[in-house]
Amino acid sequence: MSLTITPLSPALGAQISGVDISRDISAEERDAIEQALLQHQVLFLRDQPINPEQQARFAARFGDLHIHPIYPNVPDTPQVLVLDTAVTDVRDNAVWHTDVTFLPTPALGAVLSAKQLPAYGGDTLWASGIAAFEALSAPLREMLDGLTATHDFTKSFPLERFGTTPQDLARWEATRRNNPPLSHPVVRTHPVSGRKALFVNEGFTTRINELSELESDALLRLLFAHATRPEFSIRWRWQENDVAFWDNRVTQHFAVDDYRPNRRVMHRATILGDAPF
């Protein structure tokens, strides 16, 4: 096995080379990638011209795949969703968020492939919830560890943007009905590494349940700002056929919306996870 892992920043991020994910990777390669993901939280691979079927196959080596209730998907490969700025409003990605935390079992991770890019712009940033939690003072860590927060699908997918046609409205209403607001711990324990991470995000978290509305709003503002500090984050400048694979259990990300009216097309396969604790 010739797989090479190059760390990119102290908090998170590593580049992997020496593996071709268009083919069915070996068990040894799969285990090495999983260990790298646990350590570095987000992995980047250059020059991976994969098709949707290959992308889904690679992602499925790490768990069952999720079909997104709102975003369009590849017709013959529904496990791969399409983020195409020419056809879909993707402004919700231009906010710090952890994918699908409105689910009882949010995603374990996601595999994102760059298909069409603007000449410049359209970078993505990731931030480590582990680094953010560990940098807090001990009294604040202790307080947060016993709190829960509400996550709401409609915060990132409001009706006025995602219910503009009868078909979209029906899809939005069904998604809201099937995904009512729910609670997750403010501090999540990684089910494999045991490390603790902040698990609130601006995209879906609406309030801290045990606090008053005033206290909740103030604390969430603090946590949202703290969790995305530069020293806890990494910024990736995409090239076509790049692939990113991140641990959604302990990270959040932000897609920079600075390239309009140019087009950006990305494919994402999302891996189902387990209930946060």
From Swiss-Prot:
One GO cellular component term of this record is: cytoplasm
Question: EC number(s) in its UniProt entry?
Answer: 1.14.11.17
Q: Which reaction does it catalyse?
A: taurine + 2-oxoglutarate + O2 = aminoacetaldehyde + sulfite + succinate + CO2 + H(+)
Query: Per its UniProt record, what SUPFAM superfamilies does this chain match?
Result: Clavaminate synthase-like
Positions with a binding annotation for Fe cation: 97, 99, 253
> What biological process terms from GO does the record include?
sulfur compound catabolic process
**Any GO MF annotation of the entry:** taurine dioxygenase activity
Q: Where does taurine bind?
A: 68, 71, 93, 100, 268
Cofactor: how bound? Binds 1 Fe(2+) ion per subunit.
Which keywords describe this protein according to UniProt? Dioxygenase, Iron, Metal-binding, Oxidoreductase
Q: Which cofactor does it need?
A: Fe(2+)
- Can you list the disulfide-bonded cysteine pairs? none
Q: Does the keyword Iron apply?
A: yes
Q: Does the keyword Zinc apply?
A: no
The residues the record assigns to binding 2-oxoglutarate are: 124, 253, 264, 268
**How does this chain assemble?**
Homotetramer; dimer of dimers.
Q: Which NCBIfam families match?
A: PRK09553.1
Protein family per UniProt: Belongs to the TfdA dioxygenase family.
The record, for PANTHER family, names: ALPHA-KETOGLUTARATE-DEPENDENT SULFONATE DIOXYGENASE
Role according to the record:
Catalyzes the alpha-ketoglutarate-dependent hydroxylation of taurine yielding sulfite and aminoacetaldehyde after decomposition of an unstable intermediate.
Q: What is this protein called?
A: Alpha-ketoglutarate-dependent taurine dioxygenase
